[in-house]
Design a protein with these regions (language model features):
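A structural signal for multi-pass alpha-helical bundles of membrane permease subunits
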Residues: 2-317
Length: 317
């Protein structure tokens, strides 16, 4: 009976396992293989076929002797060849100035946007954790941006920041066409959408702190700053770490805002790694370069996560 129960549990897990293997693990290994190859797509003529020549009404044309007029059409087939090149693509990516600029922008983007989201999320959570009038309505209103798609929000901000006919055109600031302003415009969109997520998680964590603990801290000191830094923040540290990891992993995949706001411009000022490798793969057909660039970014994010957890473990020890 126990063995049968285990089989039933495994049977229920099987669809999820197949889903992960088919849509996550298999594409990941195939992408890794592509990063060591030079993918070439060639149109090969496989034969010649004679087909009838049709008139305007769709009927076959005939000769004077009654035979059907035909024409020869080449049969073509798209063939994909994978030439093994080893680490050639990785060397090319590392030495590519365009990739270096994209990685630099992505790194700065992640650091600034995640930092601002964490700080604003903590501040808003502390503010709305108090009993203030209209707290429930404002709380519901603030989380609405989370439910919108990033591309739709990017397009909405494009209409707002468009310096020719947008609502903010009167300011005369080139939000999207200036290489200094454009990166911060993209960061603004990310901060606007994902600060409510940080706020919601931190608010739930704050409400989980026992009131007795806060009252005991209040008796020990009247300073709200000391209570916040000595009691509340240490208790929130695991949640803050979790939110940072989630936001770093998500922000590093930056694509939607750029595709809907700046298209990577002006020039390459707002071109992220994801946007660059997408263009390399699907516009220039350089799948090896795109896969190598993606895996290098994945390695950097994994190293960051490992160092972060190592540092956190030492702190708790």
């Amino acid at each position: 009976m126990i063995r049968w129960d285990k089989r039933i549990k495994l049977l229920f897990l099987l669809p999820a396992v197949i889903w992960v293997l088919a849509l996550t693990i298999a594409p990941l290994f195939f992408s890794l293989y592509l990063s060591f190859t030079d993918v070439k797509r060639e149109v090969v003529i496989t034969g010649v076929e004679e087909i009838p020549i049709l008139d305007k009404e769709g009927n076959p044309k005939t000769r004077s002797d009654g035979s059907i007029r035909t024409k020869k059409v080449k049969q073509k087939e798209l063939q994909i060849k994978y030439d093994w090149v080893g680490f050639k693509k990785y060397k090319r990516v590392v030495n590519d100035k365009e990739y270096q600029d994209a990685a630099k922008f992505t790194f700065i983007y992640v650091i600034i946007s995640v930092f601002v989201e964490i700080v604003l999320g903590l501040f808003l959570a502390f503010l709305f954790n108090r009993r203030i009038y209209g707290r429930g309505f404002m709380r519901s209103l603030m989380i609405l941006p989370i439910f919108a798609t990033p591309f739709a929000i990017g397009f909405m901000f494009f209409t707002i920041l468009f310096e020719v006919s947008g609502p903010l055109a009167w300011m005369g600031i080139p939000f999207l066409s200036n290489h200094n302003w454009a990166p911060f415009s993209v960061m603004l969109v990310d901060i606007w959408q994902w600060t409510p997520f940080c706020f919601l998680v931190f608010l739930a964590a704050l409400q989980g702190i026992p009131d007795d603990l806060i009252e005991a801290a209040t008796l020990a000191t009247k300073s709200a700053y000391k209570i916040w830094t000595s009691v509340i923040l240490p208790l929130l540290q695991p949640i803050i770490v979790l939110v940072i990891l989630l936001r770093v992993a998500e922000s590093a995949k930056l694509y939607d805002y750029i595709a809907s706001l700046t298209k990577g411009g002006p020039g390459t000022a707002t071109q992220s790694v994801s946007f660059l490798v997408f263009n390399k793969a699907f516009k220039m057909n350089d799948f090896g370069y795109a896969s190598a660039g993606s895996f290098l970014m994945l390695i950097v994010v994994m190293i960051f996560v490992m160092l972060f957890f190592t540092r956190l473990r030492k702190t708790y020890e």
